From Swiss-Prot:
NCBIfam families per record: rpoC_TIGR
InterPro entries per the UniProt record, alphabetical: DNA-dir_RpoC_beta_prime (IPR045867), DNA-dir_RpoC_beta_prime_bact (IPR012754), RNA_pol_asu (IPR000722), RNA_pol_N (IPR006592), RNA_pol_Rpb1_1 (IPR007080), RNA_pol_Rpb1_3 (IPR007066), RNA_pol_Rpb1_3_sf (IPR042102), RNA_pol_Rpb1_4 (IPR007083)
Name of this chain's protein: DNA-directed RNA polymerase subunit beta'
GO CC terms: DNA-directed RNA polymerase complex
Encoding gene per record: rpoC
Keywords per UniProt: DNA-directed RNA polymerase, Magnesium, Metal-binding, Nucleotidyltransferase, Transcription, Transferase, Zinc
Residues where Mg(2+) binds: D462, D464, D466
Enzyme Commission no: 2.7.7.6
Length: 1400
């Protein structure tokens, strides 16, 4: 009988059932208990017999037999001797598989330190003993003695003595008066002698006493390690090894190659070194060799063991014969090729194939074309079993032959096997879950896989040679999941934003667009048709054209379910399109009675999905695809070079811009503007010109042309392609027929001279050269950024992988407030789009009538959002993942709608991974898309505010002055202009820049499009608030101010230079003061002098003695020249935000509300303090480098959270000062801005899920009576548990603040050490986990994949739940039995059967 079958019933090692895994330091006893024998010899196998040497590294006596059930000498063979130990060769007769699990050990002649606990920073041994790593190494490597027991001598405990000092001390105090040792033995004794309880108490006392922050931190670190050893059951001396375990031989195999040579695992070499040195040391000790030789041997043994555990961490890397570093045990786990990432998290699978893909337009959406040859190979086992079942073959061999000969009956059987058996298609790179989808295979001839055109956008596939892999789900459960969850027909919506992803593109869009065009004056205009037959007849007999305006009787079912008839004005093409639309009262003909662009089609699909359900949508999609292809082919659209129309006004615009640029040049030569300002203005002028030419071109291309008979001519084909969204964009058309415009240098700056030609006219040599910059940069960027994007996705997945929907509702009353996002007066994200599919955190009421629109706790659907919009609600509080109160995972209410299904989210959905994929996937796509516009520069600098509504002006914090030129100027930074509609609702608010010209005032009525304010975007002014005479302070020629002569103009301009770097300039405080008629410095209205401090690089606009009025400009600070905004700023920016890095020049934020006061300067920093408005708070002081521009004056009032120094705020500051909600809003907005710039839609909830994971830790501020240490970071779960325990025992709980961790840090500090170790820094994670005796509860996805279980998400989540219920029932039954046994001790065994409690 087959051995394997026998072994099913008595496996060599029983399968283990476990709920958690614990890791700790192995004690010598533990290592010996694992071992099956000591390895005494370094030999591996005998070179003649090829049998393993006894007591060697492959010894059969220790590790088990080489062949199944056969001892080494061959005396006992076969199953019947199972378990016997041969008396000749001492080998147990058993399965050879035990060679994979039996371990051995090496008994060391001298103890050695474990390198991970010694060298992995921070050094655990060093921290416990409070010694530096340098000192430890000196002891370990036999340079210095350490005093263990000073006795009555003057020596101190743990004092280091060199050889001479040691001998001198022995002479001085006598041989036995003190104990000092050297080497690992000494450190082992020190560790053994530690009294952890005593040290713990001592450290806590010291921490209470110390005031120094640094010392407190140092003590806290040491205390943490002491506690780790106290509570984990690890003993400190176990960090020094006396026994080294040897891993099973089949995990470090020796494989014979042809030609009599062997390939071996590096570990064997490393073990051999250890054994050789150990044996030599034993021999030297027996021979009583001189001390110096023994010490050298011990040092070499330490080095050998170090190399075995972690080669290259200390000293030189040990290399093999071919100068290649040997792979140590640590290297086996680390990195992409290590055990975790190569074998445990990413396995290769059988039953798969790959081939090139071609388009399959006649397939249905749920089908894919599978080549017959491929199917035959993939489904072989199924075919064999079916052949056997049908009696066509009796043995596997026969079946094999039939299949190889490809007999007709085999093809019939293949058809049966494949029917209803889905296969998975995958296209690399799999950036999100739609990169693997299930299809039903259709057998085809040929060797290429056929793919349905509509799923291409989900796979990001095209047919230019892409390849795809096919996988076969084998088990019934796998087939079920593939069909129900992964079928392409079940993935119509994009998980990132809930929009349809099965959308037509390219040819299909063009065909549908062509079908829906309406033109005036075509033959048959105004005819009326009663039904489709008539219409088709007229079309075929050419009485009417597809685009003719006609009237048609449309039969339709209204909301009440009655049949109604409408007379429509439409075109023949649109009627044909209307035939495929599902009949539903919610889908009137108006949905498609318009020009169908890609956007419109996507909208129609979305509506069909929401109103008619999934099945109808799939049918509809397939039908419009066929229609689109057919009409694109019928239309026969093509284009020639005359279709690219160069606008007639092009040269006029170019000439006028050239004149303008000359003017700027002249102004610069006259010294009116600086070089930077000239550059900005020229670039601005040219980008405006480019836009204008593009506009003109679009106007001419899209213009309606009339034929001689008055009918409209065919639309320009290039315009059709771009306008429909089939191919090309206005930006590309501009380059073809307008002007290419400005180009960027590789550094990102814009070249001042634009490319005036377009591709139709052809570029001159110089223009061509200028344009190569941008193109080349685009290509280089792509290569670099694809990698970065992949790495970002990996970090995101890692931080969010254990975020799963675990409950329906956590019942929290917390939430975050949502408003529309307005950028520069235009709404970039409406309130409706942000709250759709979220749960209301409180009742949403109509502001006018106060009636409830949405109840608290209800999911907001499309109709609710529409109602909220109609009511004019400005702000809605919603539930969010950030405020969900569940300990593990997130609840369904806080998450809201599952975007990919359009229904409330299911229990067990892995929302963390979906969030990570949704954020990471466009990253890669964007990086690949940078160069499409060929580096053509895109500038957008907003410097005008126009009203978007009619209404009345309300100004908050009004401060307006009329300057010398008669303009109204904003004098403060926090002035806000709001536009209010007649019933008092705020429609828009605009923050007005300091120094902006304001064109309206309080109470004015404005019309839509009216200009409210404008400013110069390239400079920041410093304005005067009083009328008087200018005087300078500390503005000394060549010390704090320099007159620079512009070489090209000969005009001088005065710029403030860095005065600290000049001689004697350290105490200067350059300023402009304004004096009255009496020559004294004037006072400002709010107190303080009229003294305006200047920062480096300020350009003076006034002279001494000049008269100024309020609102006049004293000086201006030029801002950076405009860089192109490209995703280059994008990806690194997203990574920076998720990693929560402090920006380089971070903004300084006011921590309290109060009044600004300037204090005495400190070295080269300015001292600024805020006197609080609230008397209970303490004043705050800030030191600000002198070069930074502080735009506040003495006596200004700031609000909590206002910027004192401009810049990007550090997210940690926002969290500390304004709290979680503000931080979330900031991160969500900043990240969304990057994606919005690229036109990528991502739902806010995905970013919220990631931010939630970044906020899982709490920093203890006061430890109370708990065991936590103030200053340490604790997991939220642990924090709450320990505090609950403290409250229960009547003790004082600890307090703490949430801390924001970057995603990498958060991943490494997750509760699961498996997850962290498989992410990065494996050594450090495992060392720390072992010292703490960490327990991995196996809650996340990664840990479960690593231990080889179903993940606790999706179908795995329900399995886990069922298991929980079963355990509970079993417990109940056992408890019941125990009770009964207690009541009736001598009852008969036939107790009545227990009734089972109902399942939950």
């Amino acid at each position: 009988m087959n051995q394997e079958i026998m072994n099913l019933f008595n496996p060599t090692t029983p399968a283990q059932v476990f709920d958690q895994i614990r890791i700790s330091i192995a004690s010598p006893e533990k290592i010996l208990s694992w071992s099956y024998g000591e390895i005494k010899k370094p030999e591996t196998i005998n070179y003649r017999t090829f049998k393993p040497e006894r007591d060697g590294l492959f010894c059969a006596r220790i590790f088990g037999p080489i062949k199944d059930y056969e001892c080494l000498c061959g005396k006992y063979k076969r199953m019947k001797y199972k378990g016997i130990i041969c008396e000749k060769c001492s080998v147990e007769v058993t399965l050879s598989r035990v060679r994979r699990e039996r371990m051995g050990h090496i008994e060391l002649a001298a103890p050695v330190a474990h390198i991970w606990f010694l060298k992995s920073l921070p050094s655990r041994i060093g921290q416990l003993l409070d010694m530096t790593l340098k000192d430890l190494e000196r002891i370990l490597y036999f340079e210095y003695y350490v005093v263990l027991e000073p006795g009555l001598t003057d020596l101190k405990e743990r004092q280091l003595l060199s050889e001479e000092e040691y001998l001198r001390a022995q002479d001085q105090y006598g041989q036995d008066s003190f104990t000092a040792m050297i080497g690992a033995e000494a450190i082992r004794e020190l560790l053994k002698g530690l009294e952890l309880e005593k040290i713990d108490a001592q450290l806590r006392a010291e921490m209470a006493e110390t005031d120094s922050d640094i010392k407190h931190k140092k003590l806290a670190k040491r205390l943490k390690i002491v506690e780790a050893f106290r509570y984990s059951g690890n003993k400190p001396e176990w960090m020094i090894l006396t026994v080294v375990p040897v891993i099973p031989p089949d995990l470090r195999p020796l494989v014979p190659l042809d030609g009599g040579r062997f390939a071996t695992s590096d570990l064997n070499d490393l073990y051999r070194r250890v054994i050789n040195r150990n044996n030599r040391l034993k021999r030297l000790m027996e021979l009583r060799a001189p001390d110096i030789i023994i010490r050298n041997e011990k040092r070499m043994l330490q080095e050998a063991v170090d190399a075995l555990f972690d080669n290259g961490r200390r000293g030189r890397v040990i290399t093999g014969a071919n100068k290649r570093p040997l792979k140590s045990l640590a290297d086996m786990l680390k990195g992409k090729q290590g055990r975790f990432r190569q074998n445990l998290l990413g396995k290769r699978v059988d039953y798969s194939g790959r081939s090139v893909i071609v388009v399959g337009p006649e397939l249905k959406l749920h089908q894919c074309g599978l080549p017959k040859k491929m199917a035959l190979e993939l489904f072989k086992p199924f075919i064999y079993s079916r052949l056997d079942a049908k009696g066509l073959s009796t043995t596997v061999k026969q079946a094999k032959k039939l299949v190889e000969k490809e007999r007709p009956e085999v093809w019939d059987i293949l058809d049966e096997v494949i029917r209803e058996h889905p296969v998975l298609l995958n296209r690399a790179p799999t950036l999100h879950r739609l990169g693997i989808q299930a299809f039903e295979p259709v057998l085809i001839e040929g060797k290429a896989i056929q793919l349905h055109p509509l799923v291409c956008s989900a796979f990001n596939a095209d047919f230019d040679g892409d390849q795809m892999a096919v996988h076969v789900p084998l088990s019934l459960e796998a087939q079920l999941e593939a069909r129900v969850l992964m079928m392409s027909t079940n993935n119509i919506l994009h998980p990132a934003n809930g929009q349809p992803i099965i959308v037509p593109s390219q040819d299909i869009v063009l065909g549908l667009y062509y079908l829906s065009i309406m033109r005036e004056g075509l033959p048959g205009e105004g005819k009326v048709f009663a039904d489709l037959a008539e219409l088709e007849h007229a079309l075929y007999s050419k009485v009417i054209h597809l685009h003719t305006k006609i009237k048609y009787r449309w039969h339709w079912v209204n909301e009440e379910g009655e049949n109604t008839v409408r007379l429509l004005e439409t075109t023949a093409g649109r009627i044909l399109l209307g035939q495929v639309l599902p009949k539903s009262p919610k889908l009137p003909f108006d949905v498609i009675n318009k020009l169908m662009t890609k956007r419109e089609i996507s909208g129609v699909i979305d509506q069909v999905y929401r109103h008619c359900g999934q099945k109808e949508t799939v049918i509809f999609c397939d039908r419009i695809m066929a229609l689109g292809f057919f009409n694109a082919f019928k239309a026969g659209i093509s284009f020639g070079k005359d279709d690219m129309v160069v606008p007639g006004s092009k040269w006029k615009i170019v000439d006028s811009t050239r004149t303008l640029a000359k003017d700027f040049e002249q102004q610069y030569n006259d010294g009116l503007i600086t070089h930077g300002e000239k550059y900005n203005k020229v670039v601005d002028a040219w980008s405006k010109a480019t836009e204008e030419i593009a506009k003109e071109m679009m106007k001419e291309i899209s213009a309606v042309r009339k034929a001689p008979d008055g009918s409209e001519q065919q639309v320009n084909s290039i315009y059709m392609m771009a306008h429909s969204g089939a191919r090309g964009s206005p930006a590309q058309m501009r380059q073809l027929a307008g002007m290419r415009g400005l180009m960027a240098k590789p550094s990102g700056e814009i070249i001042e001279t634009p490319i005036i030609s377009n591709f139709k006219e052809g570029l001159s040599v110089l223009e061509y050269f200028n344009s190569t910059h941008g193109a080349r940069k685009g290509l280089a960027d792509t290569a670099l950024k694809t990698a970065n994007s992949g790495y970002l996705t990996r970090r995101l997945v890692d931080v969010a992988q254990d975020c799963i929907i675990t409950q329906a509702d956590c019942g929290t009353s917390l939430g975050i407030k949502m408003r529309a996002i307005v950028d520069a007066g235009t709404v970039v994200a409406s309130l409706g789009s942000r709250i759709l599919g979220r749960t209301a955190g409180e009742d949403v009421r109509d502001p006018a009538t106060n009636e409830i629109i949405v109840k608290r706790g209800d999911l907001m659907e499309e109709r609710d959002v529409e109602a909220i919009h109609q009511a004019g609600v400005q702000e809605v509080k919603i539930r969010s993942a950030l405020t969900c109160e569940l300990v593990n995972g997130i609840c369904g209410k806080c998450y809201g709608r599952d975007l990919a299904r359009g229904t409330p989210v299911n229990h067990g959905e892995a929302v963390g991974v979906i969030a990570a994929q949704s954020i990471g996937e466009p990253g890669t796509q964007l990086t690949m898309r940078t160069f499409h516009i060929g580096g053509a520069a895109q500038i957008n600098e907003q410097s005008v505010i126009e009203s978007n509504f009619d209404g009345k002006i309300v100004i908050k914090n009004r401060a307006i002055a009329r300057n010398g030129e008669g303009h109204n100027v904003a004098m403060v930074r926090n002035m806000v202009i709001a536009i209010v509609d007649p019933d008092g609702t705020e429609r828009a608010t605009h923050r007005i820049q300091y120094g902006a010209r304001v064109h309206v005032d309080e109470g004015d009525m404005v019309k839509r499009g009216q200009r409210i304010a404008e400013w110069d975007p390239y400079t920041r002014p410093i304005l005067t608030e009083v009328e008087g005479t200018i005087d300078f302070e500390d503005l000394i020629e060549d010390q704090s101010i320099s007159e620079t002569l512009d070489e090209s103009t000969g005009i001088a301009k005065r710029i403030v230079i860095d005065w600290r770097s000049t001689r004697g300039g350290a105490d200067l405080r350059p300023a402009i003061v304004i004096k009255g008629k009496d020559g004294k410095v004037l006072k400002l209205a709010r107190g303080g002098d009229a003294r305006y401090m200047l920062s480096v690089d300020a350009i003076l606009s006034v002279d001494v003695g000049a008269q100024v009025k309020p609102g006049d400009i004293l000086a201006r600070i030029s801002t950076e020249s405009a860089k192109t905004r490209d995703i280059t700023g994008g990806l690194p920016r997203v990574a920076e935000l998720f990693e929560a890095r402090r920006p380089k020049d971070a903004a300084i934020i006011a921590e309290i509300a109060g009044t600004i006061r300037f204090g005495r300067d400190y070295k080269n920093k300015r001292r600024l303090s805020i006197e609080p408005l609230d008397k209970n708070e303490e004043a705050r002081e800030y030191l600000i480098p002198k070069g930074k521009h502080i735009h506040l004056q003495d006596g200004d009032v700031v609000e909590k959270g206002d910027f004192i120094v401009e810049g990007n705020p550090a997210p940690h500051d926002i969290l500390a000062i304004k709290g979680i909600e503000e931080l979330a809003a900031y991160l969500v907005n900043e990240i969304q801005e990057v994606y919005r710039l690229q036109g990528v839609l991502i739902n806010d909830k995905h970013i919220e899920v990631i931010v939630r994971q970044m906020l899982q830790k709490i920093e203890i501020t006061d430890q109370g009576d708990t065991d936590m240490i103030s200053g340490e970071q604790v997991d939220k779960i642990e924090f709450n548990a320990l505090n609950a325990k403290a409250v229960e025992e009547g003790k004082k709980p600890a307090t703490g603040n949430p801390v924001l961790l970057g995603i990498t840090k958060a991943s490494l500090q997750t509760r699961s050490f498996f997850s962290a170790a498989s992410f990065q820094e494996t050594t450090r994670v495992l060392t720390e986990a072992a010292v703490n005796g960490k327990v991995d509860p196996l809650e996340g996805l990664k840990e479960n994949v690593i231990v080889g279980r179903l993940i606790p998400a999706g179908t795995g989540a329900s399995m886990a739940k069922i298991r929980e219920v079963a355990v509970k029932r079993d417990r109940l039954i056992l408890d019941e039995r125990e009770k009964q046994a207690a009541i009736v001790p001598a009852a008969a065994p036939e107790a009545e059967p227990l009734s089972l409690p109902p399942a939950e």
